[in-house]
């Protein structure tokens, strides 16, 4: 399926312009419509405290949130207009602890959502969605853009982290609009062992053949690494290959308000330096 409807989360952070630029580049490459989404994060305070605060405080908080959203929306529209791209912007609201859930709901009505990697130096992290929570909740693929920005290309040289599991299979399928345009694709398996329920007799060969039938130029590689070093080995291979995109399954689940992530997913997200396409 082609990507024709993209959603990008925008905010006031220093990384937002780079994320918007990446989203615009993707929208132009796929002749897709782009929507920006700003979520006004309302303070999550105990009910008894909220009731004690004066009405003027509530009004000022709402006004400041609205003004921040409108400024961010204006910057987004200006960037899209400079690129000659058709785009619109939405503004929604949610409690600080519910921003990820709000973004996930909007993402369900897009082909792809573009999110930002968490920046440890950025203030007010509760006002921004957690990429892993959005991916686990939206049922759509996401591209997570590093907070340091991206290079001149996204998806020309791709590494697929392949373990023959359901999540990786979903990620490869969701990434096909990019993979079919890529100049090179490496299917990378860590510690692969032939098993009837997963890797075949020649690990990676089955998915490589499937991709080749879509016209993808693909190579298969295996790496050996301890369980705790798999993420580091994947990231190292990305750098060696000069890759500009990693495709991987998002492993984990959410229970109540607790997010439980698989080890590789948990380790890759904070360390990534190129965009990561994730699906669950």
Where are these regions (language model features)?
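Short histidine/acidic/glycine/proline-rich micro-motifs that form metal-
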Residues: 14, 62-63, 93-96, 119-121, ...
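Amphipathic coiled-coil/heptad-repeat helices and related helical stalk/stem segments
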Residues: 19, 99, 127, 168-171, ...
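Generic structural signal for helix capping and beta-alpha/helix-loop junctions
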Residues: 44, 97-99, 122, 152, ...
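A short acidic, glycine-rich active-site loop
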Residues: 56-71
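P-loop/Walker A phosphate-binding loop and immediately adjacent motor/lid segment at beta-alpha junctions
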Residues: 77, 81, 86, 123-146, ...
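Structural beta-alpha unit
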Residues: 78-113, 213-246, 253-255, 274
């Amino acid at each position: 399926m082609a990507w024709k409807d993209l959603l990008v989360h925008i905010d006031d952070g220093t990384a937002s312009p780079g994320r918007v630029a990446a989203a615009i580049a993707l929208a132009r490459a796929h002749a897709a419509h782009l929507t920006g989404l700003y979520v006004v994060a309302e303070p999550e305070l105990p009910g008894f405290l909220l009731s004690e605060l004066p009405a003027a405080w509530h009004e000022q908080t709402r006004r400041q949130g609205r003004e921040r959203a409108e400024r961010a929306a204006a910057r987004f529209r200006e960037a899209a207009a400079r690129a000659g791209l058709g785009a619109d912007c939405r503004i929604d609201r949610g409690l600080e602890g519910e921003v990820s859930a709000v973004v996930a709901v909007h993402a369900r009505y897009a082909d792809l959502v573009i999110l930002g990697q968490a920046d440890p130096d950025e203030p007010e992290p509760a006002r921004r969605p957690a990429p892993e929570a959005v991916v686990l909740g939206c049922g759509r693929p996401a591209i997570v853009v590093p907070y340091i920005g991206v290079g001149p290309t996204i998806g020309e040289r791709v590494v697929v982290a392949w373990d023959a599991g359901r999540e990786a299979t979903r990620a490869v399928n969701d990434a096909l609009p990019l993979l079919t345009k890529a100049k090179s694709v490496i299917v990378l398996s860590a510690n692969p062992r032939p098993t009837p329920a997963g890797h075949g007799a020649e690990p990676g060969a089955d998915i490589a053949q499937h991709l080749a039938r879509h016209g993808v130029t693909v190579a298969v590689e295996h790496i050996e690494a301890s369980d705790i070093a798999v993420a580091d080995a994947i990231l190292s291979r990305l750098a060696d290959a000069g890759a500009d995109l990693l495709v991987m399954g998002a492993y984990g689940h959410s229970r109540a308000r607790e997010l439980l992530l698989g080890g590789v997913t948990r380790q890759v997200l904070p360390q990534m330096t190129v965009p990561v396409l994730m699906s669950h």
